[in-house]
Amino acid sequence: MFRDMGPLPSHQEEALVQITAAYLRDALPRGEYLAWVAEDKAMPPIIIGGAGVQLRSILPRPRPGEDDLELGPEAIVLNVYVEPTWRRRGVGEALMRAILDALAARGIRRIVLHASGDGRRLYERLGFVATNEMRLTPR
């Protein structure tokens, strides 16, 4: 996935794997990170896509146009990836619909993501809208 997004320096690959594995060993059992995979049912089955959600606590806030406050965690959709040969075949949409259903079942009403150019149309079809979010990456 990260190679497809741009250059991943070879010296960072092993560290990325190790640190991510350590994070997931801690976050998955606590329910802080939720994960989905899509499989090809060939024998043996192979993973053809995946996606994750990180839950984070945020302060209560007003909901524009609503009478109640927005409470509870915010879901950040991360690492949505489909193997290139499986793209444009509904795998990404199936992953996202599974995520949205699971989050709705948990009562999570605020979901954010950072859309790639390739994924933007899918997210818009699912009801996501562009916002005014900005980012600073201090050096």
Predicted feature locations:
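Active-site rim helix/loop that mediates acceptor-substrate recognition in acyltransferases
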Residues: 12-41, 58
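Conserved acetyl-CoA pyrophosphate-binding loop and the N-cap/start of the following alpha-helix
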Residues: 86, 90-98
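Conserved GNAT acetyl-CoA-binding A-motif
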Residues: 96, 103-115
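Conserved catalytic-core motifs of GNAT/GCN5-like acyltransferases
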Residues: 58-64, 112-118, 124, 129-139
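Helix-loop element at the rim of GNAT/NAT acetyltransferase active sites that forms part
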Residues: 1-11
